Structures are given as structure tokens and as C-alpha cells.
Amino acid sequence: MIFDIAGLAQVASGSARSYTPRLLGRVQFHPPYPAWTHTFQPMFKRRLAWASDEDTADNCKDAPKLVWLLDIRAETNPVIIGTAPLHADDGARCKAGGRFGAHNLHPNVPGPLYKRLENTTVASWFNGGVRLFRAVESPSGVPDAPPHVEEIGYYIPEAPPKNPSGTVQINHAIVDERGLIYANDRFTGGLYILRYTGRVPLD
């Protein structure tokens, strides 16, 4: 959903006591895909957005839970233009234990401690680890051809000791202002601090 929240400035200034955001547009892809959406993260300069589902069941009982790329140039009519690719062996992760599928995305929070990502996103994927995706312009040369999603990196830790699922369960992934990635396991694995070393920029 995309809302007009311009009226919040009046609340902040004290000229209005309350404000009800106005719905501008929405995209509905649950169904046919299983609900529900967890995170919506715009890339404002490109007028694109990432949206992640939330996996909530073990062993892919609510699969697939994906990361989507949307065109939000027309705020009243957001359109899905791509999905993040899966690995060839991801089917095996459905049987490995615990959850497998999309969850959180790095938030583009204003302030000095978060890296502002306008072309990429970093996603938590439970036993699929941490996955990095980029919205890549079409090489076709066709005007206004939509970008597509490419994976530019991933990290899947070993199963932490005593994790009840028998697998890692990466729950969050956040990128700081230096480009370091902080990811946590939702049970016993603690915090992982990662440095991206790929050739494609994490920007």
C-alpha cells in the first residue's frame, strides 16, 4: 500500500491535532501467492521498491515466500516487475529444518548509522542465510524496459549449536554506514558481522 502522509506535517507543527493518511494505491499478490507482506522498502531515486514476504512456517509449509521488485512511478498503480531469484538447491533447504524464505529487508532509515541503498537490498532468509539483490537495468536498449533482479551475494552460516531447528535461522539483516552487514539468528546463533566483497557495488 502507498499512502499520502503529507498532512502529518500539520500535526508536527501543531496546526492540526490528527491526520488520517490517504490511500493512494496498492498491489495485491496474496492470493495467488501465500500471504503476507513483511517489509516494503522504496528506492526513492529510482521510483522502485522492494517488498518481502514473511515466512512463518517450518519446512516450506507456506512457500514460496519471496522478495519482489515493484515499479512505483505511478503511485496510484504500483506494479510488480520482478522477483528475487532462488538457488538451484533451495528445495533441499525446505527439508533441512526450520523456516526457509524471505523475511526482513535492510531499512533505509534516515540518519548517520544506516547505509542508504538505492540499487540493492539485503534480505534475511532464515535457513537460506543472508541474501543480497540488485535491481539491474535491462541490457536490451528498449526504452523504459523494466529492470530485473540479480543476486550479487549471499552468506549461509553453519547451524548454530543447540538451535532447535538444526539449521541457522537468520531473522534480520541491517547495513551500517560503512557497509558492514549485521545479521542475527532468531534462536542461539547470536550476531554475525559480515563484509561484502563482491565486485558489484552495495549501494
Q: What residue spans do the PLM features occupy?
A:
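Feature marking well-ordered beta-strand scaffolds used for ligand recognition
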Residues: 1-203
